[in-house]
């Protein structure tokens, strides 16, 4: 969730205000994939404030950095499919501010992209072992590995459960994406809703 909250406004702002640095942003966001997890966790431990060390919040921060490339690219792909500038200008002309435009206009149109980013992040966390083991936290992948040493059946069942949950999420995104593609004028409907609410407010 933290990854989505950070990446969605960032991607929208880059597309609207700073289109010239889109390639630079793509290069920056891909760094967590290039840098080995061991180097990443050691670097985070070096720069992290003292109160965060040894807490689950530090591991959450590391997962945010690790999931950033996948979340940003999923949202970026969704933004490329929209006439973003026209939608935002139309929303602003109806009196909607930046926050309202983002939450009430852009987010519904980016529902499939955001869900894809969520699923990719969840799948990454469910399969990430190195960071959690080095940080001495028993996350789901670490628990599976530890139990595989004593009970192979339990670890296999847990792995299948993780695959099943990920598959269900992916199927849900596919269904939502299919429904959204069949609709026409989805952005116009959202803008009409904003206009109607503004009219009522006046």
Q: Which residue stretches match the model-derived regions?
A:
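Glycine-rich helix-loop "coupling/hinge" segments at transmembrane-helix boundaries
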Residues: 125-153, 186-192
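Short cytosolic juxtamembrane segments of multi-pass membrane proteins
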Residues: 177-202
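Short glycine/proline-centered loop/turn elements that form peptide/ligand docking sites
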Residues: 82-87
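Ca2+-coordinating acidic residues in Ca2+-binding motifs
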Residues: 89, 139, 159
């Amino acid at each position: 969730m933290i990854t989505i909250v950070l990446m969605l406004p960032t991607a929208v702002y880059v597309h609207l205000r700073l289109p010239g640095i889109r390639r630079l942003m793509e290069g920056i966001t891909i760094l967590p994939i290039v840098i080995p997890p061991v180097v990443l966790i050691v670097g985070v431990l070096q720069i992290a404030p003292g109160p965060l060390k040894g807490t689950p919040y530090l591991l959450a921060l590391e997962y945010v950095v690790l999931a950033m490339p996948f979340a940003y690219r999923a949202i970026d792909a969704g933004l490329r499919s929209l006439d973003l500038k026209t939608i935002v200008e139309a929303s602003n002309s109806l009196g909607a501010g930046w926050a309202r435009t983002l939450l009430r206009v852009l987010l519904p149109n980016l529902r499939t992209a955001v869900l894809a980013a969520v699923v990719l992040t969840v799948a990454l966390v469910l399969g990430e072992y190195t960071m959690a083991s080095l940080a001495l936290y028993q996350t789901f992948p670490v628990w599976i590995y530890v139990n595989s040493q004593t009970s192979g059946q339990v670890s296999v069942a847990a792995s299948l459960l993780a695959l099943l949950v990920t598959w269900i999420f992916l199927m849900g995104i596919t269904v939502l994406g299919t429904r959204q593609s069949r609709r026409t004028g989805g952005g116009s409907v959202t803008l009409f809703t904003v206009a109607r609410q503004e009219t009522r407010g006046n």
